[in-house]
UniProtKB/Swiss-Prot annotation:
Taxonomic source organism: Cereibacter sphaeroides (strain KD131 / KCTC 12085)
Subcellular location: Cytoplasm
Compositionally skewed regions (Basic and acidic residues) per UniProt: 155-168
Protein name in UniProt: Cytidylate kinase
Keyword annotations: ATP-binding, Cytoplasm, Kinase, Nucleotide-binding, Transferase
Keyword Repressor: no
High-level lineage: Bacteria, Pseudomonadati, Pseudomonadota, Alphaproteobacteria, Rhodobacterales
A GO MF label: dCMP kinase activity
Length: 206
């Protein structure tokens, strides 16, 4: 059985949390595609060529402890704007998406570029201020020293870069379900996603 769930959205909107919960609920495989770009970005900050880093990426690179840092996020956004880097990572993502048993992929262009044929497409968003608060709490728990205002500025700059890039700009797929998590608890947001997937599965059985 092949069933693909594409979950897109800006940073700290909740798509990663929702994706992991959905994958666990349905026993689907999960891929955080942002980690691919963060891993490439981290290699580039160490002096690697972006395209070579993308072509040589392996699963071990996705386990680095520094991939959730603000620096890795900014580097990811920069390398993601390079068409050659995106092309090098597309095949990996598409192969993962059509694996047997179902798959959940979260990122910024899954429903629009990587898997436009996905059975379910969600676009998860939240207000800038709420996303900054969430990311600040996440980083502070790990000993981060960035202020909430600095994180807000970083998020807005990354959003601008992601929306304006020529290669796969950040935007909802025309048939994506919009899920605004600003006022939702994690459980409520996850339940909405599960309901959308179950509805699509039921339609497929009709």
């Amino acid at each position: 059985m092949r069933f693909t769930v594409a979950i897109d959205g800006p940073a700290a909107a909740g798509k990663g949390t929702i994706s992991r919960a959905v994958a666990t609920h349905f026993r689907f495989a999960h891929l955080d595609t942002g980690l691919l770009y963060r891993a490439v970005g981290a290699k580039v900050t160490e002096g690697a060529d972006p395209v070579a880093a993308a072509e040589g990426l392996d699963l071990a690179d996705l386990a680095r402890d520094d991939l959730r840092s603000a620096e890795a996020g900014q580097a990811a956004s920069r390398v993601a704007a390079l068409p050659e880097v995106r092309a090098a990572l597309v095949a990996f993502q598409r192969s993962f998406a059509r694996r047997e048993g179902g798959a959940v992929l979260d990122g910024r262009d899954i429903g629009t570029v990587i898997c436009p044929e996905a059975e379910v497409k969600l676009f998860v968003t939240a207000s800038d201020e709420e996303r900054a608060r969430r990311r600040w709490l996440e980083l502070a728990a790990k000993g981060g020293t960035q202020s909430e205002a600095e994180i807000l500025a970083d998020l807005r700059e990354r959003d601008r870069r992601d929306r304006e890039r020529e290669a796969a700009p950040l935007r909802p797929a025309p048939d994506a379900l919009l899920l605004d998590t600003t006022e939702l608890t994690i459980d409520a947001a996850v339940n909405k996603a599960i309901e959308a997937i179950e509805l699509r599965q039921a339609q497929g059985r009709e």
